[in-house]
């Protein structure tokens, strides 16, 4: 699993926190950030440079003109797909954790209100 990331030398893809991608001249720059260890100010990161793929395409469907376009490297596209899988999974886990915590807070509120209601009923019984 994550063969493209492993081919870049990333041995523990599960430690990836996030990534950024930017274009610089004729290159795409991929920067991968790893989870911070306790006591670290900055996250560890690695940077990779991918040359953009050049293609010559028809400029318009009617004429005979051609133009050169640049696209993201196919290898980089595969790496980004794997990074998206990792980063999306992390977001899903965070969302699930948030939902569980919200459900617990709601349950706590319901139980607290019910206890107060029962105690009030008991108080009414003891006054008689």
UniProtKB/Swiss-Prot annotation:
Species of provenance: Klebsiella pneumoniae subsp. pneumoniae (strain ATCC 700721 / MGH 78578)
Phylogenetic placement of the source organism: Bacteria, Pseudomonadati, Pseudomonadota, Gammaproteobacteria, Enterobacterales
Name this polypeptide is given: UPF0325 protein KPN78578_01770
Domain of life: Bacteria
Pfam family, one: DUF3461
Annotated family: Belongs to the UPF0325 family.
InterPro entries xref list: UPF0325
